[in-house]
Amino acid sequence: MTDVTVKSLAAEIQTPVDRLVQQFADAGIKKSDVDSVTQQEKEILLAHLNREHGSVPNKLTLQRKTRSTLNIPSTGGKSKSVQIEVRKKRTYVNTPEAEQAKAEEQAQREAEEQAQREAEATAQKIAEEKAKREAEEQAKREAAEKAKRQAAEKEKVTNQQTDEKTKPAQTDKARREAEAAELKRSVEEETRRKVEEDAKRVAEEARKMAAENEGKWPEPVAEQTESADYHVTTSQHARAAEDENDAKVEGDRRSRTRGGKATKQKKGNKLSESKADREEARAVGRKGKRKPSTLQQSFNKPVVAVNRDVVIGETVTVAELANKMAVKGSQVIKAMMKLGAMATINQVIDQETAQLVAEEMGHKVILRRENELEEALMSDRDIGVEAAAEHRAPVVTIMGHVDHGKTSLLDYIRSTKVASGEAGGITQHIGAYHVETENGMITFLDTPGHAAFTSMRARGAQATDIVVLVVAADDGVMPQTIEAIQHAKAANVPVVVAVNKIDKPEADPDRVKTELSQYGIQPEEWGGESQFINVSAKAGIGIDELLNAILLQAEVLELKAVRTGMANGVVIESFLDKGRGPVATVLVQQGTLNKGDIVLCGFEYGRVRAMRDELGRDITSAGPSIPVEILGLSSVPAAGDEVTVVRDEKKAREVALYRQGKFREVKLARQQKSKLENMFANMTEGEVSELNIVIKSDVQGSCEAICDSLEKLSTDEVKVRIVGSGVGGITETDATLAAASGAIILGFNVRADASARRVVETEGLDLRYYSVIYSLIDEVKQAMSGMLAPEYKQQIIGLAEVRDVFKSPKFGAIAGCMVTEGVIKRNNPIRVLRDNVVIYEGELESLRRFKDDVSEVRNGMECGIGVKNYNDVRTGDVIEVFEIIEIKRTIA
């Protein structure tokens, strides 16, 4: 081959000249762009590049497409033509295994040639040495014989001696050549035998290595024949003829399509039949005994398990998890059963369960965060980082036991009459107010003290800075007082104790201090950290001292907040107003909330259409520690949800819908989670009576508290099921739901509209209104008590001792008895006792006194008793008469 320059070679292989020169230098060949390159240097460069980058197996792919027509007979003697297009593909791969086998064969052949050459050289060398040694020995023998002979007649005998000397030499030479040839043959046979043994050993090692590699993922060596195109092995003329036939078939199809009618094929028309048609006809002629196609694919089942990276979201179904791990759904269900969880293939499971199952099956789990949109929305907020934090008013929550004077104390501070407006004189939802004092502003949260409002008190403690614990001086520490202390400690909030009702004669502040010290509230005069202020909400005693104590505690806490930027806060209370829509009471914690802001509140979103303070006045903005009512949300938010102002309303809507969907999925995943240990409990659920209830309330917090209280009333025999609950008036939808589920409707501070009342009258539903939570809970208890199974008690009413036994033809054995205790009545159940052991339990059939039938016999009188179906009465037995009394059960 003619040598080329480096520059022309770079142009030929389409690579920069500098890069090619550098590659030659890396391979150990110094070249410039004008130097010539030999074929040997090209091979050296190619070997170097293969070592550096790895060799890619040569691959040749041939594709072919065949179109044909298939006639399918149908009903009515007609036939339907179906156009078939067959695409074939054949790939030739120069696999590394073939190259390795070729290299091994070449190495074996070279080894045999080398061994043969070495054997020939060794044999020739041995033969030459042996011939030389024999020639020397022969020369010595001849010299000895020559010395012994007489030198007589030298001239005459010279020719004769020469002839005699030449003849043995020729004979010896022939013998030496024969021995050398024999030695050469033996050496060649020995060498060939060794070479064959080496070749067998190499072949055996190669076979073992192939057997080991066969157990792993096999390379598609059979790809040449498996995915082969038929036309590759045919001749050029056969391919041309078949292409011409396919072209004619395609032309006929197009002409029929243009003509608008499909002409019927002639039976013997070979031109209109393609290769696929002919194969189909032969298959039908053999009655379905079709020859297996050479295009059949083979699959070798993998032996080694494949570990995958499984990406799991917050919720996933069993079928989706199985697809991610590339296993059957039954295997995932089996793995979950081994872990103690029952599941179906379409069941939604939570992220933790899916992670356990995937790791149990040997896969690597990647947990995916699906709230990226929410994080992006929250990060794109102007929160006034550059602005300096300013002092803000403290948020004070008033907590304590019911009727200890919390609202009355706040009422005196605000100089309003709120307590008189509360139903029953007790607070039923959180009231948020801010008060301007001489020393600064204070925001008060008034929480209910009833036991049903536990979650509302906890919510108030989490949103507050200081807790004012109101304890009545005449009542001391009560259960809700203890609960308030626990909420304050859980929220890590300082406590200021207000000992109320100090003006009463029976007031004992020292007892309150002693009782509170048992729960970790130590007064300052005892060395503790809590301030104790004696107050009277009625007389106004100690109110200024209480406010000063609150402000002093706030100064110690150094409460600060940023007033500029987008606001965030917490929902204190929410309800549905018929004229204004969803209304939420929001306590602003950071920033400034303005009218027109876009807010994201839990599962709800919206634009603030209007803002009002606690007095009902319209305002346009609210800073930190200010409670406001906002209008414009999509629905009623849950109390305790975080309120955040965002920029984009569209993204806020997407985040709210995403939260709703996730909440629903997680809730379903938790509900459907069925453990093996709960199976027996689930089997007996059908025996429990259920009281279905539909609850409507005026505010979200009260509705939540009522639902929690009623669900806690459930027992093993009667279960309270809240069919529906909500905020707002009772509508026709609520009445229809109650009628369909057989539920009673409870309205708390709400009323039913005209359409709902019409459904209630038509269906005969039980509709009740309440304004105090005590009455609601008590009446539900009574309804549950009526659903309890009755309890029966056996009460002994009389004892009679058998003195004698008589025989009666009508009743059999008659016991003559003396009534020793109580009254004996006819037709009552009795027991026969012998030696204080019950031997029979039955019914009293006959009761007589002096041969007269009587209904009862009193203490100290004699009578005759006939026991029904029992004749084994003996003297000395005791007959015990009792009656069964039904006991009315109640819910504790």
Curated annotation (Swiss-Prot):
<dbReference type="InterPro" id="IPR053905">
    <property type="entry name" value="EF-G-like_DII"/>
</dbReference>
<keyword id="KW-0396">Initiation factor</keyword>
<feature type="domain" description="tr-type G">
    <location>
        <begin position="391"/>
        <end position="560"/>
    </location>
</feature>
<dbReference type="Pfam" id="PF11987">
    <property type="entry name" value="IF-2"/>
</dbReference>
<feature type="compositionally biased region" description="Basic and acidic residues">
    <location>
        <begin position="270"/>
        <end position="283"/>
    </location>
</feature>
<dbReference type="Pfam" id="PF00009">
    <property type="entry name" value="GTP_EFTU"/>
</dbReference>
<dbReference type="InterPro" id="IPR009061">
    <property type="entry name" value="DNA-bd_dom_put_sf"/>
</dbReference>
<dbReference type="GO" id="GO:0003743">
    <property type="term" value="F:translation initiation factor activity"/>
</dbReference>
<comment type="function">
    <text>One of the essential components for the initiation of protein synthesis. Protects formylmethionyl-tRNA from spontaneous hydrolysis and promotes its binding to the 30S ribosomal subunits. Also involved in the hydrolysis of GTP during the formation of the 70S ribosomal complex.</text>
</comment>
<feature type="region of interest" description="G4">
    <location>
        <begin position="500"/>
        <end position="503"/>
    </location>
</feature>
<dbReference type="InterPro" id="IPR036925">
    <property type="entry name" value="TIF_IF2_dom3_sf"/>
</dbReference>
<dbReference type="InterPro" id="IPR044145">
    <property type="entry name" value="IF2_II"/>
</dbReference>
<feature type="compositionally biased region" description="Basic residues">
    <location>
        <begin position="255"/>
        <end position="269"/>
    </location>
</feature>
<dbReference type="InterPro" id="IPR000178">
    <property type="entry name" value="TF_IF2_bacterial-like"/>
</dbReference>
<dbReference type="Pfam" id="PF03144">
    <property type="entry name" value="GTP_EFTU_D2"/>
</dbReference>
<dbReference type="GO" id="GO:0005737">
    <property type="term" value="C:cytoplasm"/>
</dbReference>
<feature type="compositionally biased region" description="Basic and acidic residues">
    <location>
        <begin position="239"/>
        <end position="254"/>
    </location>
</feature>
<dbReference type="InterPro" id="IPR027417">
    <property type="entry name" value="P-loop_NTPase"/>
</dbReference>
<feature type="compositionally biased region" description="Polar residues">
    <location>
        <begin position="68"/>
        <end position="82"/>
    </location>
</feature>
<keyword id="KW-0648">Protein biosynthesis</keyword>
<dbReference type="GO" id="GO:0005525">
    <property type="term" value="F:GTP binding"/>
</dbReference>
<dbReference type="Pfam" id="PF08364">
    <property type="entry name" value="IF2_assoc"/>
</dbReference>
<feature type="binding site">
    <location>
        <begin position="446"/>
        <end position="450"/>
    </location>
    <ligand>
        <name>GTP</name>
    </ligand>
</feature>
<protein>
    <recommendedName>
        <fullName>Translation initiation factor IF-2</fullName>
    </recommendedName>
</protein>
<dbReference type="InterPro" id="IPR006847">
    <property type="entry name" value="IF2_N"/>
</dbReference>
<dbReference type="InterPro" id="IPR004161">
    <property type="entry name" value="EFTu-like_2"/>
</dbReference>
<keyword id="KW-0342">GTP-binding</keyword>
<dbReference type="InterPro" id="IPR015760">
    <property type="entry name" value="TIF_IF2"/>
</dbReference>
<dbReference type="InterPro" id="IPR000795">
    <property type="entry name" value="T_Tr_GTP-bd_dom"/>
</dbReference>
<dbReference type="InterPro" id="IPR009000">
    <property type="entry name" value="Transl_B-barrel_sf"/>
</dbReference>
<dbReference type="InterPro" id="IPR023115">
    <property type="entry name" value="TIF_IF2_dom3"/>
</dbReference>
<feature type="compositionally biased region" description="Basic and acidic residues">
    <location>
        <begin position="99"/>
        <end position="217"/>
    </location>
</feature>
<dbReference type="Pfam" id="PF22042">
    <property type="entry name" value="EF-G_D2"/>
</dbReference>
<keyword id="KW-0963">Cytoplasm</keyword>
<feature type="region of interest" description="G1">
    <location>
        <begin position="400"/>
        <end position="407"/>
    </location>
</feature>
<dbReference type="InterPro" id="IPR005225">
    <property type="entry name" value="Small_GTP-bd"/>
</dbReference>
<dbReference type="GO" id="GO:0097216">
    <property type="term" value="F:guanosine tetraphosphate binding"/>
</dbReference>
<feature type="binding site">
    <location>
        <begin position="500"/>
        <end position="503"/>
    </location>
    <ligand>
        <name>GTP</name>
    </ligand>
</feature>
<comment type="similarity">
    <text>Belongs to the TRAFAC class translation factor GTPase superfamily. Classic translation factor GTPase family. IF-2 subfamily.</text>
</comment>
<keyword id="KW-0547">Nucleotide-binding</keyword>
<feature type="region of interest" description="Disordered">
    <location>
        <begin position="65"/>
        <end position="296"/>
    </location>
</feature>
<dbReference type="GO" id="GO:0006413">
    <property type="term" value="P:translational initiation"/>
</dbReference>
